[in-house]
Curated annotation (Swiss-Prot):
Name this protein carries in UniProt: Pi-stichotoxin-Hmg5a
Gene3D superfamilies linked: Anthopleurin-A
Domain of life where this protein originates: Eukaryota
Assigned protein family: Belongs to the sea anemone type 3 (BDS) potassium channel toxin family.
Pfam families referenced in this protein's UniProt entry, alphabetically: Defensin_4 (PF07936)
Function description: Toxin that inhibits rat ASIC3 channels (IC(50)=13.8 uM). Also able to bind T.californica muscle-type nicotinic acetylcholine receptors (nAChR), and human alpha-7/CHRNA7 nicotinic acetylcholine receptors.
InterPro entries reported in the protein's UniProt record: BDS_K_chnl_tox (IPR012414), Myo_ane_neurotoxin_sf (IPR023355)
Organism: Heteractis magnifica
Gene Ontology molecular function, alphabetical: sodium channel inhibitor activity; toxin activity
Signal peptide: 1-21
Propeptide position ranges: 22-34
Gene Ontology CC, one term: extracellular region
Further comment found in the protein's record: A synonymy between H.magnifica and R.crispa is controversial.
Length: 77
């Protein structure tokens, strides 16, 4: 019984610590967070490497793509 209570208190303390430690950034909350990818080369152009997908994602303005190691390199020309 004591171990269960101790484990419960430890879990509550971890949740409180994690909640307090998270940044309260307004840009993060407004959805303005910008994701950055790894640069890659595609037909002489520098693009963004997307891991574990076969096509460039829609809505990002990519108009050139090359297959890359376990993913795709997407370029905005």
């Amino acid at each position: 019984m004591d171990y269960q209570r101790l484990l419960f208190l430890f879990a509550v303390a971890m949740v409180i610590t994690t909640t307090v430690a998270l940044p309260q950034d307004t840009a993060l909350m407004d959805g303005q967070l910008q994701k950055r990818g790894t640069p890659c080369k595609c037909l002489g152009y520098t693009g963004v490497y997307w891991f574990m997908i076969t096509r460039c994602p829609n809505g990002h303005g990519y108009n050139l793509s090359c297959p890359y190691f376990l993913g795709v390199c997407c370029v905005k020309k």
